[in-house]
Every structure is written in C-alpha cells, then in structure tokens.
C-alpha cells in the first residue's frame, strides 16, 4: 500500500510549532501537521462564568472556540459563521472536544479565579484539523500558564501534563497513522485519538464509512495512535521549553520539574 505522501503506515507528517504567533495572547503557537496549519492561542483573563459564581464553584474555567478561516480549504471560500448567523455543527462539535481535552489536563482549582479562552483558527486544512488544534492548544496553554507563574499571576501552573491528539484510519485495507485529506476522504474507517502524555485516553472517536472494522483493526489503530502521541508529546515538550527558554530559563526549568521530565 502506497500513501499519497509516500509515508510509512506508522509515520507522522512533519510536525512543527512556532511560538508567539499572536503576541497579544497570553500564549500562542502556530502548529503544523504537514500542510494542516492552525493558530492556537490561550488568553487568560480574570473572572469566571456566571454559573460558577452562582453555584459557588471554586477555581477557574477553560473554554475553547474553533473556526476554519474562509481561505483554509481548497474547495472555495468558506463563509464565516458570523455571516451565516450560526455556528455550524462540525465546528461546534470540535470546539467542545478541544475544551474537554484541555480540561482533562488542567487543574481548574489551580487556575484560581481566571478563565482561559482557547481559540483555534485553521489557516490551512489538509486533514486532522481537530487533532492539530488540541495538540497546539496544549502547547499554547503551557506557555501561557508558565508565563503567568513567572509574572506572579498564578502560584503554580494548573497544567498537569500535555494532551495530544492524532488521527488513524483504515486506508486501502491497511491501518495508517495521521491521515492527510486525501487519505481521510478515501478511508473506510476513521479514528481520532486523544491521550495524555502518560498514555491515558481522554477521548476516542471512531466510525466506519460504509464499512465495518474488526477488534483487531481497532487494536492496531490504537497502537498506532499511542506510538504517534508518544512522538508528538516529545515535540510538545521541546516546543514549550524552547519558547520559555528564549525569555525565561527559570520557567523552562519549572516546567520540566512540574511535569517530572529530565
């Protein structure tokens, strides 16, 4: 089986993180999975949602928004949600997934009385925009929280570890990792896997497209996902250390100690 980009079945696309792409955000990164590129920002502001105040819920909150910019796809201009007057169902589903994934690795009590707004804006879509968004948002959060600690706005980072995501699927009767658009379009089975860096599952999304899949195929995809996420988590750690080390070596050291990494 030959993949469109010539990769091996268990090979990720080239992944990169460019920090501080949005200087006014508390933390930001441009994440690239091959030709999929997403700007992920974390804006942390004082105050919590009204429902938390009314119910006397301690700590802070984290929420996410996701959008595909009008020029992000090759199929013509995509109208903005504000022009349509409503959020489309796909974007709504994805931003809820991003929020759930980040809250799995954020101790909201340590966020104190702050709200973290996560924004993921797709610049270019070539498959895996939701998984790239989760992965990039985790890096943006790590940068934002450590900077707040350095500035004295938080006592300690509420991030308990990175969360990463990757797609898997069955393409031409073979399980593969990190699908590009052409593979995703033609795959008979599609999985999205979200995991923490210590290999705990956060969410699994999987379905057949006019097809079924066996427990053996699912196990193979899960193992591919576990392998890929291990590689992604290391890239996330390197990206955060590089971003913080440029301006604050102490923050990079605190982060390593916080995550118990050498």
Regions found by a protein language model. Give the residues of each.
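Active-site-proximal mixed secondary-structure blocks
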Residues: 3-9, 101, 147-155
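Glycine-rich, charged/polar anion/phosphate-binding loops
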Residues: 15-17, 24-28, 47-50, 103-105, ...
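Short, conserved phosphate-binding/catalytic loop or strand-edge motifs used
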Residues: 112-120
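A structural signal for small-residue-enriched, beta-sheet-centric alpha/beta enzyme cores
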Residues: 89-90, 110, 128-132, 141-146, ...
